């Protein structure tokens, strides 16, 4: 799964259908003549869901016009796109596999609470096996270990409490706004 022909040889672990970096990280290219300076490169996080809110802002449409019967999980990233030294406004991104919350990334740290088992029989996206990682979450520093091979450990790690709190806050949004069955 982490090698050719499924995932290729990349600096990241996993492939499409997993929540490891190789399955979720994709390059993004933004072009807007006269607004976004060409040649700028950034390593900041820009989630796909941010496109909606960012597009609203850039089009001058107020978020107040949106229906209030749903939760909007986006962060306005317009300043990140149009300023030369713009920094990403997203501190964390959550990883889901269907209806299963799998983990979180906050800056350079990533915590897995569940993983997709690549050795599972019938390892296709529809038949993958999800497994809890154990008593303690797997915590990786992606700047040091982009392949997510060596957990940094969970004892006395200052990031673990922050990541756990973020996961709980994110999960709480589903109480007020439960997922809707849209028939897919």
Question: Residue locations for each model-derived region?
Answer:
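C-terminal cap/loop subdomain of S1 sulfatases and analogous C-terminal strand-loop tails that border
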Residues: 1-21, 36-138, 142
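Conserved nucleotide-sugar donor-binding catalytic segment
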Residues: 25
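Short glycine- and hydrophobic/aromatic-rich loop-to-beta-strand nucleating segment
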Residues: 28-30
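Long, internal low-complexity/basic segments
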Residues: 51, 112-115, 119-121, 128-138, ...
């Amino acid at each position: 799964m982490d090698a050719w022909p499924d995932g290729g040889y990349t600096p990241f672990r996993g492939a499409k259908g997993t929540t490891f970096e190789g399955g979720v990280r994709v390059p993004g290219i933004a072009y807007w003549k006269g607004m976004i300076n060409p040649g700028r490169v950034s390593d900041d996080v820009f989630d796909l869901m941010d496109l909606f809110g960012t597009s609203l802002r850039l089009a001058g449409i107020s978020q107040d016009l949106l229906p209030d019967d749903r939760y909007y999980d986006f962060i306005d990233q317009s300043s990140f796109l149009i300023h030369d030294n713009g920094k990403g406004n997203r501190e964390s991104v959550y990883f889901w596999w269907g209806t299963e919350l799998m983990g979180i990334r906050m800056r350079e740290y990533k915590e897995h609470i569940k993983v997709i088992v690549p050795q599972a029989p019938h390892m296709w996206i529809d038949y993958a096996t999800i497994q809890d990682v154990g008593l303690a979450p797997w915590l990786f520093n992606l700047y040091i270990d982009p392949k997510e091979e060596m957990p940094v450990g969970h004892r006395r790690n200052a990031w673990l409490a922050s990541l756990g709190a973020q996961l709980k806050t994110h999960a709480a949004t589903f109480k007020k706004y439960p997922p809707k069955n849209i028939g897919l």
